[in-house]
Amino acid sequence: DGEAYRTGFFLGDGTGAGKGRQAAACILDQWLRGNRRHIWISKNAPLLEDAQRDWTAIGGLPADILELSRWKIGEEIPAPEGIRFVPYGTLRSSRVEDTRLDQIVRWAGSDFEGVIVFDAAHEMGGVAGGEGALGQKEGSLQGIAGVLLQNTLPRARVLYASATGASDVNNLAYAVRLGLWGPGTA
């Protein structure tokens, strides 16, 4: 589409190694540079507490991280700064008139250069669809939503964090910012 996309980074440390703390540190680096709009996507809503724990452990305030579901789909997010926590299930949700993806993109703005953390990034596996045991299967909705978010915010600083990454190379199709395929790759 003619956009220059910022390259992403994959954090593949094992379970319990502190990937959440490292993700929080990436956000804090930008926060201290005055860039105060970030998106933290994770497996489910209860992990908000883990994100807040990691953020506060390095000096942030719990109130800096707010879950997107505090606002109804389609409602404008009034807080101009902060970290929006979005479970994958919320990211893919929609109503006839609007989607959560559109809502978070409007909040971020077209000039967004914040960090997008895809915690448990393997949850976006299967985005490309393919052949399943029972025939052709469609791509996963949350994987598609994750790729659309990356494509819509080309200047975002994308961090994929997962202890498992992918069980099959096709399940890395969500990691579009790694430069694994496409023009200019080997």
Question: Which ranges hold each PLM region?
Answer:
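Inter-Walker segment of RecA-like/P-loop motor cores
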Residues: G59-R100
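Signature of the SF2 helicase/ATPase Hel1-core->accessory helical subdomain module
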Residues: A25-D29, R33, P46, T90-A186
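Hydrophobic positions in the central parallel beta-sheet of the AAA+
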Residues: F9-F10, R84-V86, I116, L159
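Walker A/P-loop
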Residues: Y5-C26, S162
